[in-house]
Amino acid sequence: MTVRLALQKITKKYPAVVANDSVDLTVMSGEIHAILGENGAGKSTLMKVIYGAVRPDSGQMFWNGQQVNVGSPSAARQLGISMVFQHFSLFDTLTVAENIALGLPAGTKLGELEQRITDTARQYGLDLEPQRHVHTLSVGECQRVEIVRALLSRPQLLILDEPTSVLTPQAVEK
């Protein structure tokens, strides 16, 4: 197995708190990791550092053995890193497919995208209708949209930041 991601001495400080203090983490290709801790322990901050949504104050990140500076979520996606945030970023007045298309290259054909959404959702056992408007979806269905959006990029690393925090116990079981 190869090292997919390595963090060395990642530190992120905010005016009133140190969110990450010299964190080291190694993720091998094919591994699954869970980061556990109390509220405010810096878990989400660390995930956002990996995804390029937050810049660390110090430390190094290596991707497939190469040192990288992930300065934005776009740069993370280009490397093959996707993230599902604990809070949705969907537009209620758009359809599932239209929401997902917003993060894709210009010129993406909606009909082809709808088929990819359907295929990906089925592959992972996530019921999803690409033509439904987001305002008609349950919270669980909105979370599925976010997960399928991340999976469509065929990521080498998928970050799930508390993906079940907004779901009912019944939806979590499903």
Question: Each PLM stretch: what is its role?
Answer:
Residues 1-174:
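Glycine-rich phosphate-binding loops of nucleotide-dependent enzymes
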